[in-house]
């Protein structure tokens, strides 16, 4: 087991789960949850329409090293737009739908980002978002 692998098939669909909770001080737990939530709001576009983190961090990326968002930013993609789809200004590993972006807009934007990162750094980014079907113009 690891961050990205749980020993199950990639296409497995989970319909329920059972969690084992550990008892703790309620006030401390609430404070920690609020701190985590505040950090996410400060660093990610949580109030925007996104599919979440768009690209996986490159294999072998250490916690302080090579990150997809850093590669995207270095390739000049922060704020890049196709139609109503945009690379987030706040965290550039998120693609935002500003209202009427089509699947084709998002696909084109994502592939443009991948190509620019490859051209700039030699690193191929892999989609983290599971795309289904085909995007049509």
Model-derived features with residue positions:
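Phosphate/pyrophosphate- and phosphate-bearing ligand-binding catalytic cores of soluble enzymes
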Residues: 1-108, 115, 119-137
């Amino acid at each position: 087991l690891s961050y990205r692998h749980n020993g199950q098939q990639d296409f497995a669909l989970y319909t329920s789960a059972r969690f084992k909770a550990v008892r703790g001080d309620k006030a401390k737990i609430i404070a920690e949850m609020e701190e985590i939530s505040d950090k996410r709001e400060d660093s990610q576009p949580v109030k925007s329409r996104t599919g979440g983190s768009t690209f996986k961090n490159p294999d072998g990326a250490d916690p302080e090293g090579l990150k997809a968002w850093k590669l995207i930013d270095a390739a000049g993609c922060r704020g890049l737009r196709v139609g109503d789809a945009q690379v987030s200004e706040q965290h550039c590993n998120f693609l935002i739908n500003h209202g009427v972006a089509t699947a084709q807009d998002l696909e084109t934007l994502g592939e443009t980002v991948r190509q620019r990162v490859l051209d700039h750094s030699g690193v191929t980014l892999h989609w983290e978002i599971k795309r289904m079907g085909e995007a049509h113009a």
